[in-house]
Amino acid sequence: MRDAQNNHRVALALPDNEQLQKTPPMDNTIKGLLDREEIRNLRTLYAHHLDSNNIAALDQIFSTDAVVEVTVGKMEGVDAIRAGMDDAFKLFDRDRRSSYPFIHAIANHWVKLTGPDTAEGRCYLIDFETASKPDPNPLLLLGLYADEYRRIDGEWRITRTRLEVVWPERNGASEQPANEAKDA
């Protein structure tokens, strides 16, 4: 009986340093999953920062030289992106609540790692208006973001994004991903 108890204790013991040193480094599959999750989080944080009027935090999402093409126009560089998003926020904040005049819901986000520090992806956008307006329908638009990402100084950033609106009116959305159609 005593031997069984001792064997049980040994089985629960923590590994020693020699055993830990034999543990292989992080598997590439796990690293890829962690990279994809960090990248997906960029788009979620973008929606949160924009909707809550935390425009200053967009430098945590975009590279300094990022290019953004959305319904309010094309912006190049993080300062232009902040200015453009600030103008869009003011335009939709008709009730002057200073937060959440719209809510960006992000869904179906896929990410493809194209290199050790580059990736591309797409996700759906369901954009709701929460500010008062004559039309009681809160749905503003449906669209798809096509993004390019790069790891800069150890942090993932969006380097290029294009919003394809598919409803209420299409703005050039096609079956070809915007990632591939950017030079067309």
Descriptions of predicted regions:
Residues 20-48, 52, 56, 60:
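Short, low-complexity N-terminal intrinsically disordered segments enriched in polar/charged residues
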Residues 48, 71, 135, 139:
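Short, charged/polar micro-motifs that form catalytic or ligand-binding hotspots
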Residues 22-27, 97-184:
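A beta-strand edge to alpha-helix "cap/lid" segment located at domain peripheries
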Residues 2, 9-18:
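N-terminal polybasic/positive-inside topogenic patches
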Residues 55-125:
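A solvent-exposed, acidic/Ser-Thr-rich amphipathic alpha-helical stretch
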Residues 34, 73-76, 137:
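A structural signal for alpha-helical segments
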